[in-house]
Swiss-Prot record:
Disulfide bonds: none annotated. It comes from Lactococcus lactis subsp. lactis (strain IL1403) (Streptococcus lactis). FMN binds at S19, K43, S44, N127, K164, V192, G221, G249, G250, G271, T272. Pathway: Pyrimidine metabolism; UMP biosynthesis via de novo pathway. It is an enzyme of class 1 (oxidoreductase). This is Dihydroorotate dehydrogenase A (fumarate).
Length: 311
């Protein structure tokens, strides 16, 4: 019922973790692999290992989360070794997603060259939208720099590649970014990363709740679902059909998943809710989505995918 075709591969269902959640270590990744998730993705890596920002840097909130992790990861080679080993052992399984988030265009190019030269046959996600590294702007808000980077990438990169985007809030920005993305043989876009630089306050303590950046951090969870749905829909209606969409943001229930698929997402990433609930969330959310589809008489996701009605 939930079978999903994406990047010329078949997945049992469209659900996966969002990079950054439950994917730091090989143990985390093995737990995801053993879960009911249709696919999983590694932690966004930099060439060298990073400790990330000082603690506390992640807090669960009533309707979501705030974080300023600062891209902590165990380094590019750690994750490349894992995916290559996994690929060798489990050739028949659905491909793994490998996330990178260089601190500069040059670092992204260096990592992509290593992936291109390796035997990795999965799907690469280039994160252009981390909002939590002090002093480092989100590249995908700079349209010229994004276009320049992608032009360079596609002079040598021939494997499946997606980009993870920040949320946009202006229709003109959707138009501009879609026009740029449509020039390239991208496999997908992932919309959205957390909404950058929100602020949550503990009114009892009269204080912020995370330490980095004076308490400013990326907001995730139910708070951002309307923004995520808008971004999925805006890109679904603007991108060429070869570029698929991964919907991320506020997916906690089967209902949320249904809405993302209705807007045009093909795969779905879960972040905040996975952090709160652990990998067992996939069992629950699959069941809930199947129940909604049964109730509506849908046999497959294709029956309603992207078919959001306008008034």
């Amino acid at each position: 019922m939930l079978k999903t075709t994406f990047a010329n591969a078949e997945f049992a269902n469209p659900f996966m973790n969002a990079s950054g959640v439950h994917c730091m270590t090989t143990e985390d990744l093995e737990e995801l692999k053993a879960s009911q998730a249709g696919a999983y993705i590694t932690k966004s890596s930099t060439l060298e290992k990073r400790e990330g920002n000082p603690l506390p840097r992640y807090v669960d909130l009533e309707l979501g989360s705030i974080n300023s992790m600062g891209l902590p990861n165990l380094g590019f080679d750690y994750y490349l070794d894992y995916v290559l080993k996994n690929q060798k052992e489990k050739a028949q399984e659905a491909p793994i997603f490998f996330s990178i988030a260089g601190m500069s265009a040059a670092e992204n190019i260096a990592m992509l060259k290593k992936i291109q030269e390796s035997n990795f046959s999965g799907i690469t996600e280039l994160n252009l939208s981390c909002p939590n590294v002090p002093g480092k702007p989100q590249l995908a808000y700079d349209f010229e720099a994004t276009e320049k980077l992608l032009k360079e990438v596609f002079t040598f990169f021939t494997k499946p590649l997606g980009v993870k985007l920040p949320p946009y809030f202006d229709l003109v920005h959707f138009d501009i970014m879609a026009e740029i993305l449509n020039q390239f043989p991208l496999t997908y876009v992932n919309s959205v990363n957390s909404i950058g630089n929100g602020l949550f306050i503990d009114s009892e303590a009269e204080s912020v709740v995370i330490k980095p950046k004076d308490g400013f951090g990326g907001i995730g969870g139910a708070y951002i679902k309307p923004t995520a749905l808008a971004n999925v829909r805006a890109f679904y209606t603007r991108l060429k059909p070869e570029i698929k969409i991964i919907g991320t943001g506020g997916i906690e229930t089967g209902q949320d998943a249904f809405e993302h698929l209705l807007c045009g997402a093909t795969m779905l990433q879960i972040g905040t809710a996975l952090h709160k609930e652990g990998p067992a969330i996939f069992d629950r959310i699959i069941k809930e989505l199947e129940e909604i589809m049964d109730k509506k008489g849908y046999q497959s996701i294709a029956d309603f995918h992207g078919k959001l009605k306008s008034l």
